[in-house]
Amino acid sequence: PEKERFSSLVADQLQMKHLNRSEAGLSNDGILRKTIKYCEKEPVDFAVIQFTKYSRREILNIKKPLPDTSPYLRINAGNPSKGVKEYFAKLSTPEDDIANFYKNKFLIEFYLTAKKIPFYFLQLSKKIKRGVATDRWLYHKSAWDEDYFANYRSSWQKYGDNNKPVDCIYQILGGDEDSGSPYFTSSKRPHPNAEGHRKIADHILKKL
């Protein structure tokens, strides 16, 4: 339920109105674009940005008829098209994913700072365990134990606060559904349960 989401819990505690702009399957490129588009039109007192998996990407699909709600082709595990499979199998690299993450983080940070909008960042990326089928590894079988943020660097990290780690949802919740954390639903696509959202909200409130 919406009232149990961490965004609602934080807003209720602060006695503020809020708008949850989350969108399933959106890439960090899309999060950057939507954030700027909204902030250019509406007054914002505070922004909590949750970055998604760094392997999610998007490209402008010029063949898609306009106007359309989203002329962007989403490149993620939820899109099983041939082009997406080819991208993950032959083009995607951890170096490029990390560079793109830090680029988007820097641009959102720069924009919000220029607009004098206070912000707090979270992210969803986590250490990949051997054999886990997630995005790239759905189509490319060379999975291995990997901590992307520790092992891959980007020139974008020189800018802004990019050398400071972004708090990860899975760290806040003490792991993920596979490691036995009690803060997730038991569905095929696990998400934080009510207790998990409460824990995330408490973490954000401590950071404000």
Where are each of the predicted segments found?
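Alpha-helical cap/lid subdomain in secreted, periplasmic
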Residues: 36-208
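Serine-esterase "nucleophile elbow" of acetyl-processing enzymes
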Residues: 1-30, 36, 40-41, 192, ...
